[in-house]
């Protein structure tokens, strides 16, 4: 009968257990791929003390118990050791065909993970407290609440893949960010009727910004996304039927420059009606066009709105223009305008028609929203004044019905 192996304290070691010359305990096992794997600890059991100068750790037999539980539960004991960066790369590899801006966003997040200590951690070691600490570090590094929330959502999706693949049991990113960070997101600006009138009047009269008057007016009267607006070409305008055909958007990337993309969703492909003000504004835009050399981008040319270099304008151009316009207005007027972006004009358009009682499905179509919830809950901003006006309108209708009856 073979003699039982013992450690340096005379304790019998079980099958697979051994002790190295430096005193560290070792457990050897064979993984699902037939490859030998090893687990180490300075302690055999939980009550042991670690040698002087060594960091405290989980005992070998506690680690063996966790390992055996993982194997019993079908957990991939190799897969759970992949790093967070590797897991995120695995998720992205499962959906390789994405838009360029999505690809750019993925790269940004991967770069963040590579620089953060969480990125090199094995996914089985990441706890909810670790994920929350990551969110706090992101905030301390200047990232906005909404940006952190978007990145958290991506990592949460990555861990769902790990759960489905039996690499981990729980999702450490399954928590509400607002329980960790204050939501400092600035409410989206919706212009009042008075603010809208003042903005247009100032732009029309100002020597610097009068050239942008029709652009602002069209954005307010069509509700187009700025990428759709910037991508408009002459063939997209149907003056006979008074509509704008939307089937593409123009974007610009710092690395690849200008490029054309299809709309964000299938619902983005639509025909937006031209109200009279938009119709006349488009007519003025065409009348004022110069016979400059036309650029071509991904097969599209005859862009309507060009910068000084005869390249089509994009979001950054309009953001800068609106910022300068509002700054100049506020310099000379006591009744200040709020921070306004091109997207503020889209919000204003949607809110105006929602408050006017437009059929929600019709408004959803015009806005190009993928689902009705976005139209109702995300863009349509109700105010006390609009709520009061709506109540008065309904009460007036009821009174008229009674008189007729």
Swiss-Prot record:
Q: Can you give the residue ranges of the Core-binding (CB) domain?
A: 79-163
Choose any GO biological process term that the UniProt entry carries and state it: establishment of integrated proviral latency
SUPFAM superfamilies tied to this protein: DNA breaking-rejoining enzymes, DNA-binding domain
- Cross-referenced InterPro entries: CB, DNA-bd_dom_sf, DNA_brk_join_enz, Integrase-like_cat_sf, Integrase_catalytic, Integrase_recombinase_N, Integrase_Tn916-type_DNA-bd_N, Tyrosine_recombinase_XerCD
Q: Which UniProt keywords apply?
A: DNA integration, DNA recombination, DNA-binding, Transposable element, Viral genome integration, Virus entry into host cell
Domain of life of the native organism: Bacteria
Tell me a Gene Ontology molecular-function term this record carries.
integrase activity
Domain Tyr recombinase, by residue range, is: 186-392
Q: What are the catalytic residues?
A: 225, 264, 343, 346, 369, 379
Family that this chain belongs to: Belongs to the 'phage' integrase family.
Write down what this protein is called.
Transposase from transposon Tn916
Q: What is the lineage of its organism?
A: Bacteria, Bacillati, Bacillota, Bacilli, Lactobacillales
